[in-house]
Amino acid sequence: MSTQKLWGGRFTETGAKYVDDFGASISFDQLLAAEDIAGSLAHVKMLKKTGILPAADVDQIVAGLETLAERQKQGELEFSTVNEDIHMNIESLLTEEIGPVAGKLHTARSRNDQVATDFHLYLKHQLPLILDRLHELETVLVDKASENVETVMPGYTHLQHAQPISYAHYLLAYYQMFKRDMERFEFNLKHTDISPLGAAALAGTTFPIDREYSAKLLGFSEVYHNSLDAVSDRDFVLEFLSNASILMMHLSRFCEEIVSWSSYEFKYISLSDQFSTGSSIMPQKKNPDMAELIRGKSGRVYGNLMGLLTVMKGIPLAYNKDLQEDKEGAFDTVTTVLTSLHVFTGMLATLTVNEDRMADATTNDFSNATELADYLANKGIPFREAHAIVGKLVLDGLKKQRPLQDIPLKEYQSISPLIQEDVYHDLNAKVAVERRHSLGGTGFDQIRQELQRAQTQLSAYQSETTD
């Protein structure tokens, strides 16, 4: 491989090796090798179509690039920091493959639009993989919710028992979060599906190129309509990192509850041994390490977002070398998101729900206090007065260790003769859940309707991606 830099004509001195190493990005942007070759193939075919390059030259370049593409698939390409980045490494390898005619490939193109094209292609390929993983997670959520429609558990506010809910209702809350994540990534894909190829360095080119043609060859839906914007834009990457951060936040919240609920104090759920680890010193331990790791990995994704935001905030138009720092965080985030989703989905699919423990937790926790207040309000007592009455009953019950459903009817009627035997029906946790049939509520009928809606949405995605 040549040690002569492809841009070296203007220079009389060579840089020191440590300077070359500092400026080189090939250690990480080699991940874009397939996209770089694909972009070059589309570009040179466009040069042939427009008559900018002779057909014979183009055919030779195409053959060389196709050879490199095959070698890349086999992992046979060797790169050098002397050639800095993936673009110049590929061109150098092409020169070795076909000779000086390879130098014509860069006609009407700059590394500025080249790297932007590579990055667009990379995320364009990765986003559907993330969407598929999210769809798999949503499917498991819906399946698990379908199995637990009538599994009653405490609902929490401030991590205090608040009102009884269905475990399925809890799971479907996360389904809605992940559904919004999917919608954000789908919108992100639209912003990624735009070709910057042909913008050249920043001002376009004097050659009669056909940008729409090269965009079509690469599968892009449209092209950038401002060459400065085309080479300067990293909004699509920031949007991806932002969406990924929100997704990881959702996973982290879920993992926090998995960690807590699998503890001895809660015992609401039990994790499969496949997704747990032990202790090197304490034989009894079964640690929720995978949930903790996913929770922890949210921080590195946040860091990747803040890193690129900080890089971008001070960059004038158009390209600046700072933009070399846009890739490692994005690459890391793609890997982190894909692996986190894969592990989390398996963990959720295999966890066991302790229905009896969840139900027991609603028995003596006074989470039916709102039911009693509503009962009194329905009997004509103003809600604020009912709220105060029930608050005093709860305080008394805490002192006597007596839940609301154990208060004798005679004692209730001393508060109001309107209270009848049916009050005990309303104080039952399962009944309390079932009666919350307002739209979006935790009532069993509402949950079944939401499950049906979710299954329709999942089927629609499946149909769209298989057509």
Curated annotation (Swiss-Prot):
Q: Which GO terms describe its biological process?
A: arginine biosynthetic process via ornithine; L-arginine biosynthetic process
Top-rank EC class of the record's enzyme = lyase
Q: Which UniProt keywords apply?
A: Amino-acid biosynthesis, Arginine biosynthesis, Cytoplasm, Lyase
Q: Which GO terms describe its molecular function?
A: argininosuccinate lyase activity
Q: In which pathway does it act?
A: Amino-acid biosynthesis; L-arginine biosynthesis; L-arginine from L-ornithine and carbamoyl phosphate: step 3/3
- Tell me one Pfam family matched here: ASL_C2
Q: Which reaction does it catalyse?
A: 2-(N(omega)-L-arginino)succinate = fumarate + L-arginine
InterPro entries cross-referenced by the UniProt entry = Arg_succ_lyase_C, Argininosuccinate_lyase, Fumarase/histidase_N, Fumarate_lyase_CS, Fumarate_lyase_fam, Fumarate_lyase_N, L-Aspartase-like
- Tell me what this protein is called: Argininosuccinate lyase
Please name the source species: Lactiplantibacillus plantarum (strain ATCC BAA-793 / NCIMB 8826 / WCFS1)
Q: Which gene encodes it?
A: argH
